[in-house]
Regions:
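Residue-level detector of conserved catalytic or cofactor/ligand-binding positions
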Residues: 186-194
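Short amphipathic alpha-helical patches
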Residues: 57-58, 159, 194
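A short, surface-exposed, charged and often Trp/Pro-enriched helix-loop connector in the C-terminal portion
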Residues: 171-187
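Short, solvent-exposed coil/turn linker segments
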Residues: 97, 159, 183-187
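Interfacial loop/beta elements and low-complexity acidic/Ser/Thr-rich segments
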Residues: 1-133, 137-151, 155
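Flexible glycine-rich active-site/ligand-binding loops centered on an Asp-His dyad
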Residues: 148-174
Length: 195
């Protein structure tokens, strides 16, 4: 979650979870910035640089039909009075890392049974227990989908260590049926003497 950063010269420290019109939001290389308003993603930016927030969703007497605009503006002002002068909106900035995440280690908790055919003509079959250990990397390709399905409404930050167990579990759930399929193919063991 992004944090406000008022300048030293500013007399206004700003409010948490309120983004004012024209605010500059820095987006670094390898990041995707999401602006969430009232729990809904309203802006997405994945280009490095400064993103300028445009709050043109607020009604103004200077746009549209004067009578309608004036009525909408008074409704907004009345709503602000009920919220103590604030906008009454919860606005948040979230940054999602789009770079490749480092090595995530995995291993099988229990051995996986695997059958190997040693000699088909003699009917020798061998069952072995396999253990798998290794590492993998991952990358968030669709930050919007990741936000909505995995980490929405995080109070401070969602670390890679929080998603690693889920990724490991999904890898193991995919690996075991794949090994079972290989085992069903009756793989033939090739010894050094038969090569």
């Amino acid at each position: 979650k992004g944090q406000k950063r008022p300048s030293r010269r500013s007399s206004n420290n700003g409010e948490d979870n309120i983004i004012t019109n024209g605010s500059g939001i820095a987006v670094a290389d390898g990041q995707c910035m999401l602006i969430v308003e009232q729990g809904r993603v309203v802006e997405v930016c994945a280009e490095p640089g400064e993103f300028t927030f445009d709050a043109s969703t607020e009604p103004s007497v200077f746009t549209g039909n004067f009578g309608d605009s004036l009525a909408e503006t008074f409704q907004t002002v009345a709503k602000r009075f009920t919220y103590g002068g604030d906008t009454g909106k919860d606005q948040r900035v979230y940054y999602i890392n789009t770079k490749e995440l480092g090595e995530i280690l995995y291993g099988t908790a229990t051995p996986i049974p695997f059958r190997v055919v040693v000699s088909e003509e003699r009917g020798y079959k061998l069952s072995v227990n396999l253990r798998c250990n290794g590492s993998f990397t991952c990358r968030i390709c669709d930050p919007l989908l990741f936000y909505t399905n995995v980490c929405s409404n995080v109070s401070t930050q969602y670390d890679a260590s929080e998603i690693a167990p889920r990724l490991k579990s999904e890898l193991m759930n995919a690996l075991q049926p794949a090994l079972a399929t290989l085992s069903a193919l009756s793989l033939i063991h090739i010894s050094e003497s038969t090569r």
